[in-house]
Amino acid sequence: MSELVYKEESYSIIGLCMEVHNQLGHGFSEIVYKDALEFEFSENGIVYEREKEYPVFYKGNLLKHKFYADFVVLDKIILEVKCVKCITDEHESQAINYLKVSDNRLALLVNFARGKMEHKRIIY
């Protein structure tokens, strides 16, 4: 059995997401959960960037479109916050796009819209 990529780090991040969900419950918009996560990261001394911008290149040329990851945590894990009925293939594709342009290996998709927080690991 293979070892989980960034096991301890991802457990810490998911734990903070669970704390936010336990405190706020479901029903808020994404921005509220992002603000709460930013608070938790700061309170727990976890290094993060919010709305991290990633340029896209084609044949060495900068394209007009850029990607914006909700969070990059510990300079290596992308965290995408969702408030949707369920995590879909489109959400996973979005995370893969972020992984491709960032050269990171792990993205965490976290859905706060349900009574029980849903999360998914995306490895690239």
Predicted regions and their residues:
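Solvent-exposed, charged helical/coil patches
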Residues: M1-V47, M117, I123-Y124
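Conserved catalytic cores of phosphodiester-cleaving nucleases, focusing on short active-site segments
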Residues: G25, A69-K85, Y98
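A short acidic/basic microdomain associated with nuclease active sites
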Residues: N44-Y58
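Well-ordered beta-strand positions
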Residues: E49, D70-V72, K100, N111
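Basic/aromatic recognition patch in beta-strand/loop cores that engages polyanionic ligands
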Residues: L62-A69
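Nucleic-acid nuclease catalytic cores
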Residues: K82-Y124
